[in-house]
From Swiss-Prot:
One GO MF term attached to the UniProt entry: chemokine activity
Subcellular location: Secreted
Protein name per the record: Alveolar macrophage chemotactic factor 2
Cellular component terms per the entry's GO annotation: extracellular space
Disulfide bonding pattern of the chain: 52-78, 54-94
Gene Ontology annotations of biological process type: antimicrobial humoral immune response mediated by antimicrobial peptide; cellular response to lipopolysaccharide; inflammatory response; neutrophil activation; neutrophil chemotaxis
Length: 117
């Protein structure tokens, strides 16, 4: 004896429905959308990822090329300190925090910040 006729539709089982929902969630992008407003994009840039920002470092750069310097101490996101310089042309470059020239540049920027306050 057959319970389903050929015209009857089958309802997916709960496990099949669960798999479909999980697949949809995995395929949905989790990052900010390209249509985000500039303010939302700036807020998203403030949030740091939980990994090292610098994969490669540059041992030296002329200090006059640097417009801004960011020092990120070692922490749970990365086991080493990172120095990121924003150049006057807008590029960001990772600098080697152990290089003597970079240590001097960081110290000079820290000293100039203390004099302004």
């Amino acid at each position: 004896m057959r319970l389903l006729t050929s015209r009857a539709t089958r309802v997916p089982s709960p496990s099949g429905l669960l798999c479909a929902v999980l697949a949809m969630l995995l395929l949905t992008p989790s990052g900010p959308l390209a249509s985000a407003s500039p303010i939302e994009a700036a807020e998203a840039a403030v949030v740091r990822e939980l990994r090292c920002m610098c994969l490669t470092t540059t041992p030296g750069i002329h200090p006059k090329m640097i417009s801004d310097l960011q020092v990120i101490p070692a922490g749970p996101q990365c086991s080493k300190a990172e120095v990121i310089a924003t150049l006057k042309n807008g590029k960001e470059v990772c600098l080697d925090p152990k290089a003597p020239l970079i240590k001097k540049i960081v110290q000079k920027m820290l000293d100039s910040g203390k004099k302004k306050n």
